[in-house]
């Protein structure tokens, strides 16, 4: 009798995706982050669901409902901080996952890569709206500043901002709709993840060498399920250390002050995972220019398949490209640091230089180096 796992209409989909899936025999730990992102999404949806049971999306009670969750709900503090720090873990995994894709040339799987970029944008939108919900000072002013950027769009900008706000300022209507969007988006993300996997399984996974591995495949289970479990345990360990020992390490103290439209915080800044984009936005004096740079700093990822001029897929055997890649990583870390600093000398100059370097490396230096490496192959 044939195994149910291979014949049952529903179970066989799971079987072909996670059990009998042929996987390259040499994929490294950098390939763990896909499954870790799935785990992060599950954690966020579950903790978010329990938070939504106690949260009220009204400007008068939102802040106190979060306080109520932390003080009066059984393990409410644990759920709330797991959700807040879970978002940070989500973004750490996301950045590493994207970085791995850039380093090993995974972006040549065009559809998988582009859906991945759309996923990144959807997660960023969800995280931004989630940050507004506790209705602290940074929530309110963050929402005001970021939504206000849309007013830079010529002709329709102001109307668009007021339409998003549901009034003439960030108020009750804004909070209510942000809560609605924040609730629905993770499920849209989950659907996009399935499409992401569908396209990935059409081609199979890439591997560190960037070579075709059809002649050397192993089943996903037990080899990579065991390998993923190690990643899962480490992720949960780091998340729990964060939640139980320093839950506010990555947060902003200003958000423990209820939102007050009459008092502006000294430094308005988003959560740490948006700081690199925020630094790029601030480094351009013109409002529309800044907004375009901000959007393009993420959308530039979609250009990677077009800018790939190397004869080799992976950077594994391309030392010059490797050097540039790590300079790009340090540049992004620098931008993250600058995004959290006030706009004054020398930070503004460093931010402008780092922003120019970011776009120059991706659009100019990496493609040129790829061509040089192609020439070096003939030596």
Swiss-Prot record:
Signal peptide: none annotated. It is a multi-pass membrane protein. Disulfide bonds: none annotated. The chain crosses the membrane at residues 33-53, 77-98, 113-133, 178-198, 226-246, 288-308, 320-340, 347-367. Heme b b562 binds at residues 83, 182. The keyword Lyase does not apply. GO terms for molecular function: metal ion binding; ubiquinol-cytochrome-c reductase activity. InterPro entries: Cyt_b/b6_C, Cyt_b/b6_C_sf, Cyt_b/b6_N, Cytb/b6-like_sf, Cytochrome_b, Cytochrome_b_C_euk/bac, Cytochrome_b_N_euk/bac, Di-haem_cyt_TM. Component of the ubiquinol-cytochrome c reductase complex (complex III or cytochrome b-c1 complex) that is part of the mitochondrial respiratory chain. The b-c1 complex mediates electron transfer from ubiquinol to cytochrome c. Contributes to the generation of a proton gradient across the mitochondrial membrane that is then used for ATP synthesis. This is Cytochrome b. It comes from Marmota sibirica. The lineage of its organism: Eukaryota, Metazoa, Chordata, Craniata, Vertebrata. The gene is MT-CYB.
